[in-house]
């Protein structure tokens, strides 16, 4: 499983899922429009046995717009996904202020290769590698369920906190690798099974702090946390 978290390394932090409730696409008195995407965040390290996810990040032009559904269409002739993030525009007086949004777009499992990602106002590219083994992951990853980014007010440095539940008493930490790839910060929380005879199935909550690269300019970055079972959350 992969955990996708969008973070702003600036004066404040923003993490979590899509920030707005979706609206009824048949809502009367509104107009369906395509929202503009400021940037497409693409995690690194997808293989052909992974569920591929990319993140659209942008702004709605004012408070009269509300995020709606999204669509992704693949063109085999160009090798590109055309992604549309729709929004509802309400015909009422509104506040002329930008409204941030971001959306996780699930593209499913893709064969090895390079795929273009095109959205209104932005484009990107996702590389799909060949899996090294027949299983869902290259390593045994911790079953991470939540991730957040915080800043140490004393040192002004950023760190991530990953949380989840071990499901066996013999699960233990081996290491957490940090891969810094520009706009994408990838965490590989690798665990191992202790060689003991008393292993039992039991849920054991964990919380682990990981230092993040702190040499980047202020802005928006994608925190990509690997987790058990080769999917995206």
Model-derived regions: residue spans:
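Exposed, flexible binding/inhibitory loops of compact, secreted disulfide-stabilized domains
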Residues: 20-233
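Positively charged n-region of N-terminal signal peptides that target proteins for export
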Residues: 1-4
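Bacterial N-terminal signal peptides
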Residues: 7-16
């Amino acid at each position: 499983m992969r955990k996708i978290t969008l973070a702003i390394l600036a004066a404040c932090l923003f993490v979590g899922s899509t920030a707005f409730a979706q609206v009824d696409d048949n809502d009367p008195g509104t107009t369906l429009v395509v929202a503009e995407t400021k940037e497409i965040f693409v995690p690194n390290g997808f293989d052909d046995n992974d569920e591929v996810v990319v993140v659209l990040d942008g702004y709605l032009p004012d408070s009269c717009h509300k995020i709606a559904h999204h669509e992704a269409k693949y063109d085999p002739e160009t090798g590109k996904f055309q992604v549309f993030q729709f929004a509802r525009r309400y015909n009422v007086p509104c506040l002329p202020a930008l409204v941030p949004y971001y959306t996780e777009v699930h593209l499913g499992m893709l064969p090895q290769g390079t795929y273009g990602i095109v959205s209104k106002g932005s484009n990107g590219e996702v590389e799909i590698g060949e899996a090294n083994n027949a299983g869902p992951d290259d390593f045994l990853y911790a079953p991470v369920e939540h991730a957040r980014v915080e800043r140490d007010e004393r040192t002004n440095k950023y760190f991530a906190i990953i949380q989840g539940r071990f499901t066996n008493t013999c699960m233990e930490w081996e290491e957490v690798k940090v891969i810094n790839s520009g706009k994408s910060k990838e965490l590989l929380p690798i665990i191992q099974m202790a060689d003991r005879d008393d292993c039992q199935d039991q849920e054991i909550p964990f919380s682990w702090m990981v230092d993040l690269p702190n040499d980047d300019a202020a802005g928006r970055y994608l925190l990509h946390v690997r987790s058990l079972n080769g999917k995206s959350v």
